[in-house]
Regions:
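Rossmann-like S-adenosyl-L-methionine
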Residues: 38, 49, 57, 65, ...
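Short, acidic/hydrophobic/Gly-rich beta-strand patch recurrent on exposed beta strands
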Residues: 118-123, 243-246, 529
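Terminal RNA-binding accessory module
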Residues: 2, 89-167, 171
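Short, aliphatic-rich beta-strand segments
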Residues: 299-311, 363-367
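Basic Arg/Gly/Lys-rich low-complexity intrinsically disordered segments
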Residues: 1-112, 176, 181
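Internal alpha/beta scaffold segment
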Residues: 252-294, 312-334, 340
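Residue-level recognition of short, solvent-exposed, well-ordered loop/turn junctions
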Residues: 133-134, 224, 390
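Extended interfacial segments that mediate partner engagement and assembly in macromolecular machines
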Residues: 156-167, 174-285
Length: 533
């Protein structure tokens, strides 16, 4: 039988709660404000939040719980343990993880890297090996692996190179300051020239084969050439010592007998160490900001300048009197530096004893002025740049430092540097020597150079390049000035190559001269002569 209500919509069923009135404490009633006693400003806290903890609840502190040790840790060894079977188990070969096992490979060293390390390849991946020379076959233990390269050290020399020699330094394996000390000096010059060619080929579009790259100018005596040192003072082996920290470690290498430093500096460092230890001096404490932090020694001719970087307590008068009494010391200074940054000249130097300036040739140099690291090669640099300049050319020099090279050139020169003390020394030397064709300007080097190139037409521009290289503003200023002659001086091969890449569309590279300013290291001082196309 068919239903009569089939296909008809049913009436909506009424809720059983529709006839109820809203509660006074409900959200609906409160929003309507039906009761004045339940307005927002008169409503009190809910009773749930006012509940007090049970008084009869006895909560013991955590420390009062008696923790019993687990029985698993108290198990005694089995009395029926079979030692024979254990020995048989130990005799079986075990599998160690890759982290605990270091790999060894025999490789051929192809070339030198920019830091003096040997470069080889394992399965087409590059590996950098310390104390390895080109054309050597060595056994290498891999210390580090990444996706792009590997690091390792030599465990055995299978076929040593003919260029290898004894480093003749007790601290060579720990210091790493002279990365090429194990190579003959003549071979060092050859490999540095090849390294320069590789860098130019990598970063520029120049035809390296067609460039006039002169052989590297070396030193007559490639030992004891460093005339300035700056070392931390630290407590080591029961006494105060000066030295350098090893690369990527916190281990100290003593530097009072370094073959790269002058013999006068080495002997003076030993005497200063003895004086500091005899007076029970303390090294720098970063927490209390007290103690001796750094020692700076500079040799200018036969004169020796000594400067201390200390904490808030300075340095005692007894120590300064004993150091000043040394025959070779001509000036003694100190400065305070308690910041985390190792800035030697943060607050300026205070003179304790001696002269305010040191005499170098015909020039006077103050303690805060830029100092010459290798005087022999600095003189060679001045001669090479003088040979590239025409005496009639008007020159703008960037980054002149204390202006010693500019003062020795015969050209009319405007020189710029950001060190105000160096510019002051250069200006005073020019006045004293009555050199009217020299002008020294203090300020931001790139900004001042752009200003002078815009307002005056110069014949030549000397750029003493920094690690940052050439900025876009300076490149634009050089382009708009139309200057015809450029001379770039740089200590960094990669930075120099990138700068030449920026200039190669406007200038031709005439000559590249390399000076071995720091023997036994992979660094060179490079002079590039460019002429506008």
């Amino acid at each position: 039988m068919a239903r009569e209500d089939f296909g008809k919509s049913k009436p909506r069923r009424k809720s059983f709660n529709s006839d109820r009135k809203p509660r006074k404490d409900s959200r609906k009633g409160f929003n309507k404000g039906s009761d004045k006693g339940y307005k927002k400003e008169n409503r009190g806290p809910r009773k749930d939040f006012d509940r007090k903890p049970r008084r009869d609840f006895d909560r013991k502190p955590r420390k009062d719980f008696d923790k019993k040790p687990r029985r698993d840790f108290d198990r005694k060894p089995r009395e029926d343990f079979d030692k024979k079977s254990a020995r048989e188990f130990d005799s079986k070969p075990r599998r160690f993880s890759s982290k605990s096992r270091k790999e060894r490979e025999e490789i051929n060293i192809k070339k030198l890297g920019i830091n003096g390390e040997g470069i080889g390849y394992i399965k087409k991946k590059v590996i950098f090996v310390q104390n390895a020379l080109p054309l050597e076959m060595v056994e290498v233990e891999i210390d580090k692996k990444t996706q792009t390269y590997m690091l390792g050290h030599v465990t055995a020399y299978k076929k040593p190179s003919s260029a290898r020699k004894d480093p003749e330094c007790d601290q060579y394996n720990q210091c790493m300051g002279c990365a090429l000390k194990h190579m003959n000096y003549a071979d060092q010059l050859v490999h540095k020239r090849e390294l320069l060619k590789e860098t130019l080929h990598k970063y520029t579009d120049l035809s390296v084969k067609d460039l006039d790259i002169k052989p590297v100018v070396g030193m007559k005596e490639p030992e004891h050439y460093r005339h300035i040192v700056a070392f931390p003072i630290t407590y080591f082996s029961g006494k105060l010592c000066v030295g350098v920290y090893q690369r990527e470690t916190k281990f100290l290498t003593l530097m009072d007998h370094c073959p790269l430093q002058t013999q006068k500096i080495n002997s003076l460092l030993v005497k200063i160490e003895d004086i500091l230890n005899a007076n029970n001096c303390r090294d720098y404490n970063d927490k209390f900001k007290k103690g001796l932090r750094f020692l700076i020694v500079r040799q200018i001719g036969e004169e020796m300048q000594v400067a201390f970087v200390t904490g808030q307590d300075g340095i005692s008068q007894t120590v300064t009197k004993e150091i000043a009494a040394l025959d070779e010391v001509t000036a003694l200074y100190y400065t305070v530096n308690t910041s985390r940054y190792q800035d030697f000249y943060e607050q300026g130097f205070k003179r304790i004893y001696g002269q305010t300036h040191a005499q170098y040739k015909d020039f006077k140099i103050s303690v805060r002025s830029d100092m010459i690291l290798n005087p022999e090669m600095d003189d060679e640099k001045t001669r090479q740049i003088a040979s590239l300049l025409d005496k009639k050319e008007e020159v703008l020099s960037m980054g002149c430092g204390s202006g010693i090279m500019e003062l020795q050139l015969e050209n009319k020169i405007v020189a710029i540097d950001d060190n105000k003390v160096s510019i002051h020394d250069a200006t005073e030397n020019a006045k004293r020597l009555e050199l009217d064709n020299k002008l020294f300007v203090a300020g931001h080097v790139n900004d001042q150079a752009a200003h002078h190139l815009k307002n005056h037409r110069y014949d030549a521009l000397i750029i003493n390049e920094t690690v940052d290289g050439m900025t876009e503003d300076l490149l634009k200023s050089i382009t708009l000035s139309g200057i015809k002659h450029l001379i770039i001086v740089s200590d960094n091969m990669s930075t120099l190559a990138k700068t030449l890449h920026q200039l190669e569309e406007m200038y031709d590279v005439n000559t590249i001269i390399s000076l071995d300013k720091e023997p036994h290291t992979p660094r060179l001082e490079i002079i590039v002569d460019l002429k506008r196309k």
